[in-house]
């Protein structure tokens, strides 16, 4: 048997070699423990270094957001199925703030507030991830609003115009057509999208907060049928979602829009509606035991909406001249616009369109109350042609409303007042539009020209809308060059106005009203006097009495 020899030098060199090549790896991980959970909220003990609004990882791939940082525990909002979170489970820090994937592949898709597709059409390839809480553009990074955002709705484009980069509030009671106005505005961007011009194209985002699933499906179907879904992203947080997801949905939508805005593109974003976001945030704050304020809302509910809506802007040329236009929606109760959340959002936005339930129920749709609706951008967001034909429209309608209320009590009116009432009734008919029927800007100009210049005065009120649609079709057939000139120059020339006026007078001669008569104004006929009514004028002269 061979003798076993041990070399101490070899053993020493082997140990030295191992020690010299050894690099100790130290890992440090903060782990917290769930102390209690319920209603989409979890309290976590531990995590001393956690940051505010940091993403926390719960078991089962569920995430939460750290909201309350207290001495002994952290209050977190759970983003997902909170019933799977149990007391005693471990919670880990991620070291990241909440972000969503963004990119052009989101067009035509329906996603949740975390950017995950929920339409069953497969995964979405993201260009990058964008944090939800980002600073809005500063004052020097912005420029004034000067480009019109055509809605295709005559009542808005004529009296409360919206510009690219503006925040225009849609406010009113439930079931007054707020969502319809917003969806029609999205549909109206189809012509710009099909033009292929990046300066005209508008990418649209519809954020549904706390809506019924059937309502969201109806909006998606309307956009699909109109061919508008290909340039629209739907961010859905339905009523069945947790308060945390409803709270985050608007920020997710604006992050997707900001990605395009900073690339120099134009974006339209609809928040439907911010009342439900405020209610979800109120629920979160009360569950986290934050002190309540007016109407039980937390003290920072104004900041909740202001930091969201300030992200809508028209960027300066140095920043790429992109824009993001916001259409926030607020639901009122009993037409009360002086409540807490409505007054907050009114003070943040650049104007509001108030939709009144009384007008809606009377058949005036869209039910926009011109009296308290306003756009603080004004004429700078209108093309010259619309500004020319609607100069005094808002004042005329306000006077019509006042006179209409007065005429309900007056037994006799003078001819001027009657003419004003007749003109006002026809203007109100011109401003009516059906759902899903936005008009191109050149047809808006022609319709408003007919109403404001008195060319509909001889048309019966019940026939105004039929006359309008048939006349627009007639203009397309016979004077398409006038309409194309309005689109190209954005102006209504004197020759164009004369052509429209002359064509309207000719068209009225061939238009038949519902009573079977011609719409052309009839010449007043002089009535012949009867023989016994004809009398000789007599002159009586009083002579002074002769002097005596």
UniProtKB/Swiss-Prot annotation:
User: Which CDD domains does its entry note?
Assistant: ATP-synt_F1_alpha_C (cd18113), ATP-synt_F1_alpha_N (cd18116), F1-ATPase_alpha_CD (cd01132)
Organism name: Saccharopolyspora erythraea (strain ATCC 11635 / DSM 40517 / JCM 4748 / NBRC 13426 / NCIMB 8594 / NRRL 2338)
Site positions for Required for activity, renumbered to this chain? Answer: 373
Question: What Pfam families does this protein's entry cite?
Answer: ATP-synt_ab, ATP-synt_ab_C, ATP-synt_ab_N
Gene from which this protein is expressed: atpA
UniProt protein name: ATP synthase subunit alpha
* Location of this chain's protein in the cell: Cell membrane
Q: Where do the record's region annotations for Disordered lie?
A: 510-548
A cellular component annotation (GO) from this entry:
plasma membrane
UniProt similarity note: Belongs to the ATPase alpha/beta chains family.
Which reaction(s) does the protein catalyse, per the Swiss-Prot or TrEMBL entry? ATP + H2O + 4 H(+)(in) = ADP + phosphate + 5 H(+)(out)
What EC designation does it have?
7.1.2.2
Membrane topology is: Peripheral membrane protein
- Tell me, in a sentence or two, what this protein's role is: Produces ATP from ADP in the presence of a proton gradient across the membrane. The alpha chain is a regulatory subunit.
Which UniProt key words apply to this protein?
A: ATP synthesis, ATP-binding, Cell membrane, CF(1), Hydrogen ion transport, Ion transport, Membrane, Nucleotide-binding, Translocase, Transport
């Amino acid at each position: 048997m061979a003798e076993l020899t041990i070399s101490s030098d070899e053993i020493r060199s082997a140990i030295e070699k191992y020690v010299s090549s050894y690099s100790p790896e130290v890992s440090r991980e903060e782990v917290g423990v769930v102390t209690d959970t319920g209603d989409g909220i979890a309290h976590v003990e531990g995590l001393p270094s956690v940051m505010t609004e940091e993403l926390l990882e719960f078991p089962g791939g569920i995430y939460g957001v750290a909201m309350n940082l207290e001495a002994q525990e952290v209050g977190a909002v759970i983003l997902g199925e909170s019933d799977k979170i149990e007391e005693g489970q471990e919670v880990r820090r991620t070291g990241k703030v909440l972000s969503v994937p963004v990119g052009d592949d989101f067009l035509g898709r329906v996603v949740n507030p975390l950017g995950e597709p929920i339409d069953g059409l497969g995964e979405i390839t993201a260009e990058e991830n964008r944090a939800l809480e980002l600073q809005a553009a500063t004052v020097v990074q912005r420029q004034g609003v000067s480009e019109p955002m055509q809605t295709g709705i005559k009542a808005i484009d004529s009296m409360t115009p919206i510009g690219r980069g503006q925040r225009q509030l849609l406010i009113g009671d439930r079931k007054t057509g707020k969502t319809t106005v917003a969806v029609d505005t999205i549909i109206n961007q189809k012509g710009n999208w099909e033009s292929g011009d990046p300066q005209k194209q508008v990418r649209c985002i519809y954020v549904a907060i706390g809506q019924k699933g059937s309502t969201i499906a109806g909006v998606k179907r309307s956009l699909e049928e109109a061919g508008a879904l290909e340039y629209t992203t739907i961010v859905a947080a339905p009523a069945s979602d947790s308060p945390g997801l409803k709270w985050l949905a608007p920020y997710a939508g604006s992050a997707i829009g900001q990605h395009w805005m900073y690339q120099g593109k134009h974006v339209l974003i609809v928040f439907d509606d911010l009342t439900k976001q405020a209610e979800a945030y109120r629920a979160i704050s009360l569950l986290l035991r934050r002190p309540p304020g007016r109407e039980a809302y937390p003290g920072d509910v104004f900041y909740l909406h202001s930091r969201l809506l300030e992200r809508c802007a028209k960027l300066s040329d140095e920043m790429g001249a992109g824009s993001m236009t916001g259409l926030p929606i607020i639901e009122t109760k009993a037409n009360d616009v002086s409540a807490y959340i409505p007054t907050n959002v009114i003070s943040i936005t650049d104007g509001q369109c108030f939709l009144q339930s009384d007008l809606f129920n009377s058949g005036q749709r869209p039910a926009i109350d011109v009296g308290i609706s306003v756009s603080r951008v004004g004429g700078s967001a209108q093309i010259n042609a619309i500004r020319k034909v609607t100069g005094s429209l808002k004042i005329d309608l306000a006077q019509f409303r006042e006179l209409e209320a007065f005429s309900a009590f007056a037994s006799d009116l003078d001819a001027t007042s009657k003419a004003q009432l007749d003109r006002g009734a026809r203007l109100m008919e011109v401003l009516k539009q059906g759902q899903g029927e936005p008009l191109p800007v050149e047809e808006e100009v022609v319709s408003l020209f007919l109403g404001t210049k008195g060319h509909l005065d001889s048309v019966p009120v019940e026939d105004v809308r039929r006359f309008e649609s048939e006349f627009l079709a007639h203009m397309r057939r016979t004077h398409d060059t006038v309409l194309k000139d309005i689109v190209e120059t954005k102006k209504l020339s004197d020759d164009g106005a004369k052509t429209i006026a002359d064509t309207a007078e000719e068209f009225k001669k061939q238009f038949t009203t519902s009573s079977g008569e011609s719409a052309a104004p009839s010449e007043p006929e002089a009535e012949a006097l009867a023989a016994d009514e004809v009398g000789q004028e007599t002159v009586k002269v009083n002579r002074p009495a002769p002097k005596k």
